[in-house]
Amino acid sequence: AELSDRVEYRSIGQTEFGREQPLLVITAPKNFPELARYQEISRKLGRAEITEAEAKALSSQGKPIVWIDGGLHANEVVGAQQLIETLYELASKNDAETLRILDEVIILLVHVNPDGMEIMSDWYMRPEDKTKRNKNIPVLYQKYVGHDNNRDFFMNNMKESTNISMQQYVEWMPQIIYNHHQSGPAGTVVAGPPYRDPFNHVFDPLIITGLDAVGAAMINRLHQEDKPGFARLDGSVFSTWWNGGLRTTPYYHNMIGILTEIVGDPSPYAIPLVPDRLIPNNGNPFPVTPGPWPFRRSIEYSVSMNYAILNHAVRHGDELLYNFYLMGKKSIDRGNTDTWTRYPKYAQDIQKVYDATTKKKAADDEEEAYFGNRSGIPLAFYDSVYADPEKRDPRGYILSADQADFPTAVKFLNALLKSGILVHRATSDFTVGGKNYPKGSYIVKTAQAFRPHVIDMFEPQDHPNDFQYPGGPPVRPYDAAGWTLAFQMGIEADRIMEGFDGPFEAVVYGQLLAPEGSSLPASGAGYFLDPRVNDSFTAVNDLLKGKVKVYRTQSASGSIPAGAFYVPAAGKKILEQAARAYGLAPSAAKGMPAGAKEIKPARIGLYDYYGGSMPSGWTRWIMEQFHFDFAQVFPMEIDGGNLAEKYDVLLFIGPGMPGAGGGYGAGAQPKKEDIPAKYHHMLGRLTVDKSIPQLKKFLEGGGQILTAGAATALASHLGLPVSNALVEIVNGKERSLTGDKYYIPGSVLEMQVDTAASINYGMGPKADIMFSNSPVFRLSPEAGNLGIKPLAWFGTTAPLRSGWAWGQNYLKQGVTAFEAQVGKGKLYAFGPEITFRGQAHGTFKMLFNGLYK
């Protein structure tokens, strides 16, 4: 940046490792004095709080802003390297095309994971022998979550995600966001836009046609330059359904998000021969010839695609800017009127009503059988659904300040604020729809430009039934099918169906909320902390570290629930600080409750392995946020035994445990002599022969193990009378249900909870969980007599809350969590990951309750 008057360096914040995260602004020198004005024009158009005449004027005065990034996944090395080449060309070339781009476009060039690049490059260059260089790093390439850093862009847990979202949705509001990735589908060079169905039903159709336009510019340029191998549409697995990725969350903000996945590596690479990819089709119009593929060629493709997008922005700048406004304006209009989103379930409702009231006519010729009923269904059936007021979208949501876990609701609101959502706060008590709300409640109206994101965070996703052919296997979503954040976090939000107003003040865009704690009430005996509030555990951990004794009630008494924390008056100072910091409202106690038991911090071991586990990393981050002390435990330490000397509780979250059928747990295994000594303790895998006996011994001696997801296979290795509930009998033999009968990709389901169990203190009788073909258990008839009891289960044939659940009727009475007495110790097994991606705040307590002794 110091060497070019076309480039300005900015830091957008610190990473999780404390590095500055860089953003380069690239444009013509003459544009820099007006940069703040162009930025403000983009923000005004994006928020759409101006008239159409103003929008047209600003669209002609402004300059389109294009975001180009790379390096998010550090092992995908093309992404970071193309940034360097693109920077060089834009900063140094003087051809007519480059100069025109610089004159007409504001380019934001961003490295989105500098920590990861440092980790990966240092590791790759470490061996002097070039033939031994590799990318098999011993740790995750983002401090906590590795590859899942591209699953964090509506929650914004990680610092890098927050930095990026604040730039995209609060500061700059680019019209196009281009996110470089690897690797392309086998037999191709690169996958890009447009993408396959389904696309999400809540965003504006101009997003889809905008993707078509940008995609056409990209593929046309590659073809003009004789660069084959661009896969699109159903030529790749990528869709526009899911929210949460760096290039998908922009769709919900009226921005055109571009993903490409390209091949290439510094090590020798070749395009493989895939016969089906040799045939030109709409998904791959210009097939590439298989054979050796130099890394430099991938960089050239990437720069060409960058230039294609920038040229598109030059030629269609005013259109991009005006459409940005138009999508926002239409969102505001939809939020101010009765609006029905066209979900698949509503189309199915129309068909069901029609079929139930109309005598079907058999197709009387081949044409009608093929094309269907050309005359359609009478319009009255449309009105039966799309004039039904119960099926309207809400006009807004109210998060009452008197809900049990309001601090978690504030965290939810901060996730929205980081994404540029407009939030209001009530300055006094008010009434809406006959219900009274206290001062300090928060309001999120849908009459705002980023309405699609608001709807997506509060309302269920309705993924279509998507199969390869009728009766065939499912087409797997690229990531989740449903994710409604309000459900995952367990917040209480009232859906308001009519227009409303009140004593509301707007929160400044992007300004995060601080929890509002209360002063401690007068009490000479002590205080209670509510176990329903997640941050009560944070306060308890602060108290325990301050050497203050803490107790838990064992039964409910009046307004004090079972599992409440009792803090003696000696802890007043620390508790007062915690209440202010975390937004807590401790209540006064008259004295120590009868039967209350003292709790102490457990010595916690969190399992991980060489290369890093993302679910373990998320759990590591969560426990740090809530102030739990812990140590990481690796396979060799487990195999070495004597676990009880160091740990009271062991956590196994997600992969790593050998499967129920035996074998080895997850984890890549380099040769010991090929890695530095400081990583040797991380080597090894859990095995049935060595690891399971040590875990069993730990349990039998009084230890506690908590497992979630795939790690629940431990129950099988221990010989517990627990089996897979999702099976059928075929020819007298038990087998797992096939995908045409049962398939539930990442979706939110509702389970019943045993609130009397101590591991469930603070939970309600129902809880929403993130479920992704997760383990579901069946307890044998003798299980109860052996000290095994269910903690949570599916109570209905239709537990789906958000997403896609084909064959969900099979889930009824399936157990989602259980506890088992093993000798003097206890095993907890949770089929769903109760810590999922740091989003599932509604089930964090199921982990936290097990972390004391």
Locate predicted features.
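Feature marks short, surface-exposed loop/turn motifs that line or immediately flank catalytic pockets
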Residues: D115-G116, G184-A186, P266, P658
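Structured alpha-helical segments in the cores of large, soluble enzyme domains
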Residues: E54-K56, E128-V139, I164, I176-G184, ...
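Intrinsic-disorder/low-complexity accessory segments
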Residues: A1-V105, V145, R151-D152, N157-K159, ...
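Short, solvent-exposed turn/loop segments enriched in Gly/Ser/Thr/Pro and often Arg
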Residues: L109-P114, Y124, N179-G187, A711
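Mobile, glycine- and charge-enriched loop segments
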Residues: L102, I107-L109, N113-M158
